[in-house]
A protein has these predicted regions:
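Membrane-embedded alpha-helical segments of integral membrane proteins
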Residues: 34-98
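Membrane-interface segments at or immediately adjacent to transmembrane helices
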Residues: 132-202
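Transmembrane alpha-helices and immediately adjacent membrane-cytoplasm interface residues
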Residues: 88-94, 107-141
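Pan-zinc metallopeptidase signature
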Residues: 319-384
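Post-HExxH zinc-binding segment in Zn-dependent metallohydrolases
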Residues: 154-156, 265-310
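N-terminal membrane topogenic signal
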Residues: 17-29
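Auxiliary, metal-adjacent structural segments of Zn-dependent hydrolase domains
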Residues: 175-243, 247
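Active-site recognition of the HExxH zinc-binding catalytic motif
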Residues: 73, 250-271, 275-276
Length: 384
């Protein structure tokens, strides 16, 4: 006997209710997290709303979290990640045993999948709120008022030479080991990090923030395997850095992660503000490291634009600078593995999900900003 569409609808509702009753709290959490993510995807087209959220709500939260966690002598972010990994492994182990040894495997498997989905979506929803909004509000160029005009090869060459000369000047103002490589005191670099942005804040109030120190990661070698020199953790508002990477790179990495801590989300802009703050700070370790970072970005662009000009500038590099650049390249070549490739693929996918590319205009945002900002200084230096 045909029950009719109304009876079929009632049956479906009872079925859905029965499924929901298997783990109601987890279903609610899953739906709430999915709702937050959906709202974020819809709202991110509203630039004004994203600006108000990022500047008026999230940055104050970051300041409070950063100041709170500054009292902890280790990376709270690393501790949370380690606990999460251990907790996940333990949870999966227990659930695997229960699936094998206890009845109602189908229901248990369903609850497990809902639990994992709810956990993943909740973390991602919080990430959208605590960091994703920065990608759709005002970027550093908009907040600072800096121009990012198209640049010529002549300008690129001049600024590349300027930073090469700066690296040459500071190469012998940093500590070096018996083999001639930079061996700056890593702990001292971290100790000085709260003051790195002090001078830059005066010119760019949009970068103002509490003077917080970057934190070294205990499992830094793991970061090297996944090609990370540092990361900003929005859940604790900490700037975390890889302490195993070459000493010549550390100070610039610290400044880069501190840029994220001060609301600069885009990677290319964070590279620029890292160089800017380090040079304004004036400390030899920071100036040298930032000069290497700037030269690397500019040199890569110049290599493609005018190879002869690049060769001329490279030939003028101090032996100590060349040694540090080559040592850094050798270090990272050791980690050229499928794990690193997979990590880079995931990270590139993450950037693309937030409509971010590695560059703007012809050479990339970092290069364009460096050339536009430092071209006048480069000309003045060349005429001295």
């Amino acid at each position: 006997m045909y029950s009719g569409p109304m009876e079929t609808t009632k049956t479906k509702k009872r079925g859905l209710a029965a499924i929901f009753a298997l783990c109601p709290a987890r279903h609610v959490l899953l739906l709430c997290a999915a709702g937050v993510i959906a709202l974020h995807l819809l709202a991110r087209a509203d630039h004004a709303l994203m600006r108000r959220l990022s500047e008026g709500a999230v940055r104050p939260i970051h300041r409070a979290l950063g100041q709170l966690n500054a009292h902890v002598p280790f990376s709270v972010a690393e501790a949370l990640i380690a606990l999460a990994v251990l907790g996940l492994l333990g949870f999966l182990g227990v659930q695997a045993v229960r699936l094998v040894t206890r009845p109602e495997r189908g229901r248990r498997l369903y609850r497990l999948l809902v639990t994992l989905a709810a956990a993943v979506l909740t973390v991602y929803a919080l990430f959208c709120l605590l960091w994703g909004v920065f990608y759709y509000g005002d970027d550093f160029m908009a907040r600072s008022g800096l121009k990012n005009d198209p640049i010529s090869t002549e300008q690129l060459t001049a600024v590349t030479r300027y930073f090469a000369d700066l690296a040459n000047t500071y190469a012998h103002r940093v500590a070096r080991d018996d083999s001639g490589l930079c061996c700056s005191d890593r702990a001292e670099i971290l100790r000085k990090s709260p003051e790195v942005f002090a001078a830059t804040e005066e010119e760019f109030p949009c970068l103002a923030g509490p003077p917080l120190a970057a934190k070294g990661i205990f499992f830094s070698r793991v970061m090297s395997y996944v090609d990370f020199t540092g990361f900003f953790f929005p859940f604790t508002a900490e700037a975390n850095v890889n302490m195993d990477s070459p000493a010549c790179d550390l100070a610039a990495t610290v400044a880069h992660e501190l840029s994220h801590q001060r609301g600069v989300a885009k990677e290319q802009e964070a590279n620029f503000t890292a160089v800017l703050a380090s040079l304004r700070y004036g400390d030899s370790d920071y100036v040298y490291s930032a000069s290497l970072m700037a030269y690397t970005h500019l040199g890569n662009a110049l290599y493609r634009a005018d190879h002869e000009a690049w060769e001329e500038i490279f030939a003028g590099l101090d032996e100590a600078v060349v040694a540090d650049l080559r040592a850094s390249a050798r270090y990272w070549a050791r980690f050229d593995t499928p794990v690193r490739t997979a990590s880079n693929t995931v990270y590139e996918g993450f950037l693309q999900s937030y409509d971010q590319t590695l560059g703007l205009k012809s050479y990339g945002a970092c290069v364009d900003l460096l050339v536009n900002y430092y071209y006048g200084q480069a000309l003045a230096s060349a005429n001295d």
